[in-house]
Amino acid sequence: KDIVGLVDGYRESAQSWRELLLDLKRRGLETGPELAVGDGALGFWKALREVYGETREQRCWVHKTANVLNQTPKSLQAKAKGHLQDIWMAETKADAEAAFDYFIEAYGVKYHKAVERLIKDRERLLAFYDIPAEHWKHIRTTNPIESTFATVRLRTVKTKGCLSRKTALAMVFKLILSARRKWRKLDGSNQLAELSHGFKTLVTRRLRYGFQCSYGY
């Protein structure tokens, strides 16, 4: 697991993400990763389809859960969250599909907006099930890099004065390098070579102040 790209860009624009992905391609990642994991940022997915059109998409379940629960009353959110967890914590894809259908049936009539937000990404939410189970917990959310971004946000918020573009980029890069020392080893890492052409995953998120970052394994 390692950082593979960091650029400054304009919010979630497709152009900013395109620059990062093209930089990865220029530096040797000519064939795109098998799977890309991220939230619902339209800019990233648009750029990914243009640069690495064969890469499969996996939506982050943490972000999607929050997005769906926002369309339900607070009194129901704990119960609905449990039913959503039944989907992405299922032991098989068949069980996940069954739990998905149950959520639609249970909430579709009264909370159709919540269900609509879920079903529009159905295939992209369940893509991780086509990968060996040892890797699931690393690729169904963006959690593996969220703690790193929290470190970056904490430091940038406390930084006083106006940073130049180069200074800000250098500071963010050093913070990520420092946080990388605490990254835990991937479960099932010894099986990566057995996957088709050395399975690669790209996990992306936008950092504070418009920095785009990706890491892969």
Q: In which residue ranges do the predicted regions lie?
A:
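Inter-helix linker motif
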Residues: 52-70
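Conserved phosphate-handling catalytic cores of large alpha/beta enzymes
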Residues: 66-91
